[in-house]
Swiss-Prot record:
Name the UniProt record assigns to this protein: Large ribosomal subunit protein bL33A
Top-rank taxon, per record: Bacteria
SUPFAM superfamilies for this protein: Zn-binding ribosomal proteins
Record HAMAP family: Ribosomal_bL33
Classification via Gene3D superfamilies: Ribosomal protein L33
Any Gene Ontology biological process: translation
Keyword Ribonucleoprotein: yes
Organism this protein belongs to: Acholeplasma laidlawii (strain PG-8A)
The family this protein is said to belong to: Belongs to the bacterial ribosomal protein bL33 family.
Length: 49
């Protein structure tokens, strides 16, 4: 079953994006490079708790 997760900017710590993830197939935390509107640049976004 897919669960909703929140992606947090690693620089300004704003919660910008939500996405889904299959926890059975991917156990590790998700990390993506996405655009942060608050920083106004592409930054690393990590899955929050």
């Amino acid at each position: 079953m897919r669960e909703k997760i929140i992606l947090v900017c690693s620089e300004c710590l704003s919660r910008n994006f939500t996405t889904t993830k299959n926890k059975q197939t991917s156990k590790e935390r998700l990390e993506m490079n996405k655009f942060c509107p608050r920083c106004n640049k592409h930054t690393l976004h990590k899955e929050s708790k």
